[in-house]
Design a protein with these regions (language model features):
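Peripheral, non-AAA+ core regions of ATP-driven protein-machinery
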Residues: 2-5, 9-12, 16-80, 87-107, ...
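Conserved Walker A/P-loop ATP-binding site and its immediately adjacent core
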Residues: 125-131
């Protein structure tokens, strides 16, 4: 391991040098150069670990859990994804495509945390402090109580933390940070792992929360070693299509809250605005009397959400028809098509199938199977379903429609937005839900027979606005 040399920093301007001087070359002040605290290289003695460690009972640790504090930013969608808010000592990794809005949402959150009384330190390795300040001015945050810094050397950053003692640290980004104890270029696997370890260790040792921005690869995976995701407490992913104004903040991992929780934001001129009722917004531009359009009642984390599934089935002249999907699992689409063909006798061998989820959101739960089958069947047979109907249910390979979780929450959200009918699997609770008609279907064949009655008819369709 490389030998660590002493470093000195100026308490007035922060200039770092490798030797002491009476006068700072940066600001000109006298007697402001002091030795900086060096980073620990970890255990070096062979004798460490030979003696038996102290036993700690879990019951003795329980009272200390009361010291775990939550801080709310006031941005409800951001706090929702974190759980109850920002946890002290938490290490958080935020990833997303370039230009999706990672720095914007963090700068907005930092400003709100600062206004709430937290001491916030924003370190940018990609922009100068003046550039961050200019962006803050554009977002209307020029007077926010945030301390800004532009640095990439890990030792200098941690020394600054020791001096400032912040409550919240934001590192933008972890791929630009380099440690002088690691003999490799910034952004390499070893550098990212070392920087993440030191920053996470700092959070656990001092009680400060650390948020690190991470780059992604071309296929959307977090760049760098997978071990970083295991180190941190929370992994957030910022997703969305550049052509859409919506941005989805999703919790991929969270030790302090539900996984797959989402926060919905809308890109505006003054930054990212939170969307308090995403279901209503996702359905605001839904057309009426259109084959292939259905509404799915889903659950993302703890939040019920309604989204529109759009399908298009066209004759194909290709030897292998296209199967294109946006926002859903392509393998699961192939399974639904196979079940429709095998169990219901609907052939797609000579047809291209396109599936899209409106608004740019991504759905992962199997409960969307029935909505996908309904959209494809509607597009294939040119059938228009009632616009006031929602669909949800998991489809098995036998064609059976299975029950899904949190049915009451799905129905409540649908009823709130004016939907009067739901088609799903048979429920254990036979008591009907007030205000909404539940139509149960045992298998996909019964569902297809049930929906055939709408062919060539537009009776029962709403006014296009649920």
């Amino acid at each position: 391991m490389a030998k660590i040399s002493k470093s000195y920093s100026c308490t007035s301007c922060g200039l770092v040098t490798n030797k002491w001087a009476g006068r700072c070359d940066g600001c000109g002040d006298w007697n402001t150069i002091h030795e900086s605290k060096a980073l620990s290289n970890g255990p070096q003695k062979v004798s460490i670990g030979i003696e038996k460690g102290e036993k700690i009972l879990l019951s003795d640790l329980l009272p200390s859990s009361k010291n775990l504090s939550y801080s709310k930013s006031g941005i409800a969608e951001f706090d929702r994804v974190l759980g109850k808010g920002l946890v002290s000592s938490a290490a958080i990794l935020l990833s997303g495509d370039p230009g999706i809005g990672k720095s914007t949402i963090l700068l907005q959150a930092a400003a709100r945390f600062g206004e709430a009384g937290l001491k916030v330190l924003y370190i940018s390795g990609e922009e100068a402090a003046s550039q961050v300040k200019l962006r803050a001015k554009r977002l209307g945050l020029s007077t926010a109580p945030i301390r800004l810094g532009s640095e990439t050397n890990l030792r200098n950053i941690l020394t600054t933390f020791e001096d400032e003692e912040p409550n919240l640290v934001i590192i933008d980004s972890i791929q630009t940070i380099w440690a002088d104890t690691v003999d490799s270029a910034p952004g390499s696997v070893s550098q990212v792992r070392s920087a993440a370890f030191e920053l996470t260790n700092y959070a656990k040792r001092t009680g400060a929360a650390v948020i690190m921005v991470g780059h992604v690869t071309k296929d959307g995976q977090i760049a760098g070693p997978r071990v970083v995701e295991h180190m941190v407490d929370t992994v957030l992913h910022f997703e969305g299509e550049r052509g859409h104004q919506f941005r989805i903040l999703r919790a991929v991992k969270n030790r302090f809250g539900p996984v797959d929780e989402i926060g919905v934001f809308e890109m505006a001129s003054e930054g990212l605005a939170q969307v308090k009722n995403p279901s209503e917004l996702f359905l605001s531009e839904r057309g009426k009397n259109i084959p292939g359009s259905v509404v799915f009642a889903g659950i993302e984390g703890t939040r019920p959400i309604l989204v529109e599934f759009q399908a298009l089935v066209t004759p194909s002249t290709l030897g292998q028809p296209r199967r294109n999907v946006i926002g859903w699992d392509g393998n699961r689409l192939s399974m639904v098509l196979a079940v429709l063909e095998s169990r219901c006798g609907i052939s797609f061998a000579n047809h291209d199938v396109y599936l899209n989820i409106a608004g740019g959101i991504k759905i992962n739960e199997p409960a969307a199977d029935l909505a996908v089958a309904a959209a494809i069947f509607s597009a294939k047979e040119d059938i228009i379903f009632p616009i006031n109907t929602v669909f949800f249910g998991e489809i098995s390979l036998s064609g059976a429609v299975r029950q899904v979780s949190q049915v009451d929450n799905r129905l409540k959200e649908a009823q709130t937005l004016g939907f009067s009918e739901a088609i799903t699997a048979p429920r254990n609770k036979k008591k009907p839900k007030d205000g909404i008609n539940i139509r149960e279907t045992v298998n996909l064949r019964d569902f297809v027979n049930m929906m055939h009655k709408y062919k060539g008819s537009t009776e029962g369709l709403g006014d296009g606005k649920p």
